[in-house]
Amino acid sequence: MHPLGRLREVEVAAVSDVKGHEINSADPIFGIEIHGLDPIPPEDAHGHPSELFWTWLGGNFNYIVLTTAALTVLFGLSLWQALLAVVVGGVAGSVVLGLCSVFGPRTGTATIVNTRAAFGLNGNFPVALVSWLSASGWVAVNSVLAVFALIELAQVAGLGNGVAVKIASVAIVLLGQVAIALFGHATVVASERIFFAVSAALIFGLLLFALPKVNWAYAGGPPLGSTPLGNWLLGLSVIFAGPISWINYASDYSRYFRRDTPSRSVIFWAFLGMLVSTLLAGLVGTVLATLVDMSNPVANLPKILPGWYLVPFLLVVIWGATANNVLNLYTAGLGLLALRITVPRWAAVCLVGAIATALTVIAVFFYNFMSLYAEWLSLTLILLCPWGAILLVDWYLRRGSYDAQALHRWGSGPYWYRSGINWPTLAVYAAGVVAAFAVANSTLWASPISTRLLGGADLSLFSGLIVTGLLYYLVAGRQIAAAAAKA
């Protein structure tokens, strides 16, 4: 018998359920999910789009998103300018995430597999690698913040902050995250409800202590950009990068829905969950950044809190990073499978966890956290925006009609193209990345066009999406129409 068949036989369904999530023997809560990238068969489909609300709310209403909002104030924006950037960036990014979620019910597979239709099965490898690096990198970025908080907690307990404490903190943080993600989809979705409930209580506690001290007329510090508009666009880009960094995850959490699930419902619930989390965390983050230097948030923020709230504050950081990384690890595991690494899904999660542990150790001992975070945000935006544009325009051109089995058929089929590569699409993606880099302004790369001609404005998000989307529409429109006519 095939190992998956034996696993299906011995799998024990969860004895308890979370409201809104159906018990399923192929995807049980606190049991090993048996599916990897293979299309979810109709008999294993389950769930409701409202699950997406809790998934994205639980995964994003946390300290790491709060820190993202704080970057807008660190860039020199006033409080109200920063809040406007949070609203505009949050709405725009959440719309894109919602749209990218519709593939799940149609194809029953992970997001990164769906772009095989545009790139070809072999041509999809470069973007699959980008997606995997993005997810794995976010595991490390979040883990670094959690490790710093755990080290502070160890100091409170009188254990010091020596090398042994740091290594133990890394191990505890990564093992806890991997333990949840390796179970699979149902466990991840169910756990995010719990993550949100605890995070909300702790984060709103921070807000209660901060509100009486807020200077609502805060005018901002020294601007990072050379013009007010350029500075605001820089802040907008950072907020937009948050939801955009999840678009390669979107269908991973909607793929178990039934094939006839309305697309509007999928879009709405994913959009709402991401938007609410971004706005709530954005409000708290911008307010706190006007009161304390957030360049080192774990060390500086406790200065404005009562002494007794230090431990709950540190738990906010650890808990939120875990909630975020459970999603990251699950998708990174699927991403590794998309690179044709022939291991079970749970083993892929463990492998990603090991790699992230190494990256976290490097960051904890040798690198400034906020520099790492800002650079990773900008790189994520530049590499994923062009890919997201191709994903969405391809959906529009095909009217959402995909051959789910052909997405996994090597050597033949409508998505095989020439030796499995659709070279025009790869060229469009490369052009989109170049267009984004050409007008980027970040700690990673500041283009001469941005600094000299645009007043420091970072237009990489607009350039990456618009240029790539238009080019792909022009290049692929006729190709897809011709293929449809032959079918």
Residue ranges and their predicted role:
Residues A45-P49, F183-F196, S245-V276, M294-N300, ...:
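Hydrophobic, small-residue-rich membrane helices and short re-entrant helix-turn-helix hairpins
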Residues H2-L79, G230-L236, R255-S263, Q479-A487:
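Membrane-interface "cap" regions at the ends of multi-pass membrane proteins
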Residues P49-L66, L207-V214, P223-L288, G307-V326, ...:
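Hydrophobic, membrane-embedded alpha-helices of multi-pass small-molecule transporters
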Residues A128, V156-F183, A197-L208, G235-N248, ...:
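Transmembrane alpha-helical segments of multi-pass small-molecule transport proteins
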Residues A85-F119, L129-S143, G477-Q479:
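Juxtamembrane transmembrane-helix boundary signature
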Residues F148-I151, V198-P222, I239-I244, V284-L291, ...:
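Hydrophobic alpha-helical segments and their helix-loop junctions in multi-pass secondary transporters
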Residues L74-G76, V102, A118, P126, ...:
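Membrane-water interface regions at transmembrane-helix termini and the short interhelical loops
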Residues P39, W387-L471, A485:
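C-terminal membrane-solvent junction of multi-pass transporters and transport-like membrane proteins
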